[in-house]
Amino acid sequence: MEIIPPRLKEPLYRLYELRLRQGLAASKSDLPRHIAVLCDGNRRWARSAGYDDVSYGYRMGAAKIAEMLRWCHEAGIELATVYLLSTENLQRDPDELAALIEIITDVVEEICAPANHWSVRTVGDLGLIGEEPARRLRGAVESTPEVASFHVNVAVGYGGRREIVDAVRALLSKELANGATAEELVDAVTVEGISENLYTSGQPDPDLVIRTSGEQRLSGFLLWQSAYSEMWFTEAHWPAFRHVDFLRALRDYSARHRSYGR
């Protein structure tokens, strides 16, 4: 037996959403600048909803990504990073992977639409997803403005360990090109030097990392950048992630005291 009658659920939901909005408006200065999101649970959502084809979950999840980014923009968040395809995901069934890459390509093109006026960057190795999808993603991203009020990173073909290795290699390659000695190469490997060569170079580290579907781990997502990030987990599968869930994450973040390891 349901405690709350169905006819009352929608009004109560709207009232709760309004209260969350009002509370956040009072703590505007405490909002995160950069939110990173692990969009987990698309396949589990599809199966729990009775769909044999998990690609339906991916499509519903893709629609939620575009919606969530609008929430970020409306809330005044400056930067959002969404984890769309990890290097581990590339080991999935070929047919499932092909469908997933096609859906990701479609949603990135939607995110990059001129009407949004968002600046979009890919983070990861597009060479891992095939020539045609990579071409479409590069074309979409390059069409977005460099200067905008809202920036989006789409992590595709991304692995946190791989990013750190790539950053160190890029750092050493630059030093070698400048004629560095072996001793100078060793001295060049610093926290600042690695940070400057990450995929997210020039951007602030994430203040808040959100993961859906009940999993409480980073799974290689922004390993270097999230050293002092606040974490927020929810049991909701990604396609079922609601605006009130997003607002609750912001509310909980605004109530925390960040010590940055001190």
Curated annotation (Swiss-Prot):
Activity's sensitivity to pH is recorded as:
Optimum pH is between 7 and 8.
The Enzyme Commission number assigned here is 2.5.1.68
Q: Name the InterPro entries for this protein.
A: UPP_synth-like, UPP_synth-like_CS, UPP_synth-like_sf
Cofactor-binding details, from the entry: Binds 2 magnesium ions per subunit.
How's its activity regulated? Inhibited by citronellyl diphosphate.
Entry keyword annotation includes Membrane = yes
Compartments where located = Cytoplasm; Cell membrane
* Coiled-coil boundaries: none
| CC per GO annotation | cytosol; plasma membrane
Instruction: State the CDD domains in the record.
Output: Cis_IPPS (cd00475)
Name the catalysed reactions. Answer: isopentenyl diphosphate + (2E)-geranyl diphosphate = (2Z,6E)-farnesyl diphosphate + diphosphate
Impact when changing residue 107 to G:
No detectable activity
Catalytic residues (UniProt)? 40, 89 (proton acceptor)
Residues that coordinate or bind Mg(2+): 40, 230
- Tell me which Gene Ontology terms the entry assigns under biological process: polyprenol biosynthetic process
Q: Which cofactor does it need?
A: Mg(2+)
Residues at which substrate binds = 41-45, 86-88, 92, 211, 217-219
* Residues annotated as site: Important for determining product length: 84
Q: Which UniProt keywords apply?
A: Cell membrane, Cytoplasm, Magnesium, Membrane, Metal-binding, Transferase
Among Gene3D superfamilies, the record links this protein to:
Decaprenyl diphosphate synthase-like
PANTHER family from the entry? DEHYDRODOLICHYL DIPHOSPHATE SYNTHASE COMPLEX SUBUNIT DHDDS, DEHYDRODOLICHYL DIPHOSPHATE SYNTHASE FAMILY MEMBER
Q: What family does the database annotate? A: Belongs to the UPP synthase family. Z-FPP synthase subfamily.
Q: Could you tell me what this protein is called?
A: (2Z,6E)-farnesyl diphosphate synthase
Q: Which organism is it from?
A: Mycobacterium tuberculosis (strain ATCC 25618 / H37Rv)
